[in-house]
């Protein structure tokens, strides 16, 4: 069904009339009985966690008032840490590998985790490996991993409520934060991760920052084993600033006196800021070229950006192992088998991931910046050329709540067109919300109170995307579809079954929340 939407003057297919989506913002209330019950479940924990999300109205008011995270944010985290029974000195036992960056920080952390896991299997060191990342793809508990596996629902619930109860009853640091209060969603999970890892005997923990570094919730660690900064670019402009050098200042905040730090080649202005901050902090910062020992190592995807991530990961893993394993000696001319296996066999869901089925080949990448979307576009075309299955090229895209995201589309559209041997780009472009299912809405782990529910119901952001794409490529069939499930089903229906081996070639990108929802639908279960 085709409708012309006014005042937008372009052809736009509207699939499944825009019914009213029920986006429930249920800030949950927990009775004394419920919260004290010994049978508190994973679902109870997720409900309680969701109640800690900052509502859209509060976020918008802060934005208009120009209120940004500052040094007080870290001071509050230290107060909450004290309330659950720990000090920053206790975190030294975790031998933290701390990673910040705009692009590739999650992938770098995954590489480090994979390398350390292979070393552990061969040498028995480290004893237990923690990995803390964000956001989650499918289930909240995947943010807190031990030995490469998300902690179980039972462990998550147990440790979640141990932290909750301590925060309810502790009388410590009453001048810093209100008694009985809890940190907001992401900070709570960071706080909980420290409790999990210290309780479970983890002896090395890899921490990915959330936003920035200097004022990030993870920046309560005073003595990381090593710090790493991946590729820098423009992201989270309101919080971090609108230039790469401003953003570099924030990211450099994770560097600590007495701990080595590494980064990779950056744009000159960012490099200078990192160097200046290293001098200010008395940190030995090394800037790495792509590691020559990667020659012959099968990095996926085989691209410069991924080799940079691998280079940084090698330096971080080697530094950690020098402290943890007295017998460890880094290879000078080549990497050890454990390092090669760790790099080649890493699993990092939702990044350059391909899933194939009868009707479609799904290419999923959680790219969400201008540069990373260009990389995702090139990778998609390369994969399509390799498979040579023909079929329509379909884009499923969303980036919710960021007005600047519309400008990301230009680079993606132009990159795919120029890389495509046929020069045609996407024949169909679908813009959807992050609502997962057509009938039941969100899975609990995906509930997000931080966006304007009216904007989601009216598909306000998606209409802006559609208008821009129709200007960029008037030949594309542009569609608005309310949910991820319906977007996937629509893409499947676009294959021409009379053309034999043809399959839809679909790229799902723009947001890890979108990619996570898509993986859950495609696999019909938790994709953990």
Curated annotation (Swiss-Prot):
Mg(2+) 1 binds at residues 134, 208. GO terms for molecular function: ATP binding; metal ion binding; tetrahydrofolylpolyglutamate synthase activity. Its EC number is 6.3.2.17. ATP binds at residues 104-107, 351, 365. InterPro entries: Folylpolyglutamate_synth, Folylpolyglutamate_synth_CS, Folylpolyglutamate_synth_euk, Mur-like_cat_sf, Mur_ligase_C_dom_sf. It is found in: Mitochondrion inner membrane; Mitochondrion matrix; Cytoplasm. SUPFAM superfamilies: MurD-like peptide ligases, catalytic domain (SSF53623), MurD-like peptide ligases, peptide-binding domain (SSF53244). Its cofactor is a monovalent cation. Keywords: ATP-binding, Cytoplasm, Ligase, Magnesium, Membrane, Metal-binding, Mitochondrion, Mitochondrion inner membrane, Nucleotide-binding, One-carbon metabolism. The keyword Repressor does not apply. Pathway: Cofactor biosynthesis; tetrahydrofolylpolyglutamate biosynthesis. It catalyses: (6S)-5,6,7,8-tetrahydrofolyl-(gamma-L-Glu)(n) + L-glutamate + ATP = (6S)-5,6,7,8-tetrahydrofolyl-(gamma-L-Glu)(n+1) + ADP + phosphate + H(+). Mg(2+) 2 binds at residue 236. GO terms for biological process: one-carbon metabolic process; tetrahydrofolylpolyglutamate biosynthetic process. A monovalent cation. The keyword Metal-binding applies. It comes from the Eukaryota. GO terms for cellular component: cytoplasm; cytosol; mitochondrial inner membrane; mitochondrial matrix; mitochondrion. NCBIfam families: folC. Catalyzes conversion of folates to polyglutamate derivatives allowing concentration of folate compounds in the cell and the intracellular retention of these cofactors, which are important substrates for most of the folate-dependent enzymes that are involved in one-carbon transfer reactions involved in purine, pyrimidine and amino acid synthesis. Belongs to the folylpolyglutamate synthase family. This is Folylpolyglutamate synthase. It comes from Neurospora crassa (strain ATCC 24698 / 74-OR23-1A / CBS 708.71 / DSM 1257 / FGSC 987).
